[in-house]
Amino acid sequence: MPIIEQVRAREILDSRGNPTVEVEVALIDGTFARAAVPSGASTGEHEAVELRDGGDRYGGKGVQKAVQAVLDEIGPAVIGLNADDQRLVDQALVDLDGTPDKSRLGGNAILGVSLAVAKAAADSAELPLFRYVGGPNAHILPVPMMNILNGGAHADTAVDIQEFMVAPIGAPSFVEALRWGAEVYHALKSVLKKEGLSTGLGDEGGFAPDVAGTTAALDLISRAIESAGLRPGADVALALDAAATEFFTDGTGYVFEGTTRTADQMTEFYAGLLGAYPLVSIEDPLSEDDWDGWAALTASIGDRVQIVGDDIFVTNPERLEEGIERGVANALLVKVNQIGTLTETLDAVTLAHHGGYRTMISHRSGETEDTMIADLAVAIGSGQIKTGAPARSERVAKYNQLLRIEEALGDAARYAGDLAFPRFACETK
């Protein structure tokens, strides 16, 4: 049996230069695995709590308390447990913390152990992680939702929408989808230069020009797709992450592109975009607690576009269940650090699929070289992954892992392509 023998932890840096937690787990059979925990810039209020140190060190963002929690409490609690019983291990972590938001020991400390245990168990079983988690039928390669133009909390510009993504839905394979996305990315750089706009990068590797607004950004990306010799809509679709909580103020409304708007007015704005651009997905179009607005928006345009819940659901089965009951969104963004254990993440995915919701696996803006989410995307058959631009090694690491998985699967590999969005046709395709 793959019994946990040793647990170690340390403080490392993420892609934004902020500290995060790395955990190592060793089993009695000699197997060893390591996991690093990501961190978000625009975080949902209802996410699992990251344990940070406060004080002057690293501007208060140190994670020595979380590391110590692993060494002093979490590690001793899981040593001796069977690593291939992930649910047992994760339940032990949840029980040990004893809070609904993992605020005592820290979601970052707990997640590091959860993921490292899963990796060690997979290695002990001599299985790739995607096969260990997903079983023998895991074979779907996801559409890469590439964030090639950054705004909002991911860039120091006046662009309110946080992410403008390209989705190579017409590619025949993941390797070709990655090539198409990379070529559009480079074409966008040329388009921006011709317009005299900045080609500096945001947190997730996308360009961060200070353009006039949403439609200006979408026009630039559409030009880049055509410049790369591809067809907007048929070959490469568009997607947005509005991260609307970031421009919502209680008592005021949505302060968006210089105008204060209601939820209904935001819905009208998005509806207008659908007729003009080949959009297949909009994430967080409204604020995280605007349940009524979300329900009305979903009823209005949910049959025309994928509506992804991130901050409103925070990968939490309880919040997702409420969303399903209220008709809120039609897809779930999956971020393992929002809920804090692999088991709870998989429970949320199962609930989403049973409720008829699509799932999109996602990175965070503060990433590491850890490639676990690439394996997770294939394991659950999500058909979609969001892990930044095809630039910066912490983003590219995930794409390269998916290339390896596609190669390992051989003839069994299937690229999701436009089947990842079966209910939504690009209106301008």
Curated annotation (Swiss-Prot):
Catalytic activity: (2R)-2-phosphoglycerate = phosphoenolpyruvate + H2O
Cofactor binding note of this UniProt entry: In the absence of substrate binds Mg(2+)-A ion; during catalysis temporarily binds a second Mg(2+)-B.
Modified residues (Phosphothreonine): T199, T341
Keyword Lipoprotein: no
Catalytic residues, chain numbering: E204 (proton donor), K335 (proton acceptor)
Similarity remark: Belongs to the enolase family.
Name listed for the protein in its UniProt record: Enolase
Species assigned in the record: Mycobacterium tuberculosis (strain ATCC 25618 / H37Rv)
